[in-house]
C-alpha cells in the first residue's frame, strides 16, 4: 500500500522523472544540462553519443525493488529489475522489461511489458545510458 502522504496526484516526483525520460527516449534530443541525473537532457557522457535508452530500477513505497518476468510465457521464473520507459500518461507508465546479457555486457529488450500506477512508486534509480537493440 502506498504511503498516504504521497498518494495524491500532485506529489509524484517519480512520475515526473519517468515523463522526462520518456520524452528524451522518444526524441533523443541534445541539451545543455550538465547535471548527471535522471533528467540529464542527453544520453551518454556527451551530447554526441548514440544511446537510445536510460534504464531504470524502481522501488515501491515499502522499499522493495520492483521485479518483473522477462517473458510473458506461463511459468517464466527469470525476472529483471531493469526497465525502459515506453509510454507515460499522467500517473500510468508502460515499461518494457530489459534483460541483462552478461556475455556482451549489455541490456536487451524483451517483449514483456507492464503498466504501473506511478503513485505507488517512491524511488527511482537511473542506470548508465545505453543502446538497446530491437526497440
Please describe what each predicted stretch is.
Residues 1-86, 94-135:
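Short glycine-rich, low-complexity segments
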Amino acid at each position: 500500500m502506498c504511503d498516504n502522504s504521497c498518494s495524491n496526484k500532485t506529489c509524484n516526483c517519480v512520475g515526473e522523472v519517468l515523463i522526462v525520460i520518456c520524452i528524451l527516449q522518444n526524441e533523443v534530443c541534445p541539451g545543455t544540462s550538465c547535471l548527471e541525473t535522471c533528467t540529464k537532457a542527453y544520453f551518454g557522457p556527451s551530447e554526441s553519443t548514440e544511446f537510445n535508452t536510460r534504464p531504470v530500477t524502481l522501488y515501491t513505497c515499502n522499499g522493495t525493488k520492483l521485479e518483473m518476468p522477462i517473458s510473458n510465457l506461463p511459468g517464466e521464473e527469470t525476472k529483471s529489475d531493469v526497465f525502459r520507459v515506453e509510454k507515460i500518461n499522467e500517473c500510468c507508465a508502460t515499461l518494457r522489461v530489459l534483460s541483462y546479457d552478461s556475455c556482451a555486457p549489455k541490456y536487451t529488450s524483451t517483449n514483456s511489458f507492464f503498466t504501473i500506477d506511478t503513485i505507488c512508486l517512491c524511488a527511482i534509480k537511473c542506470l548508465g545510458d545505453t543502446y538497446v537493440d530491437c526497440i
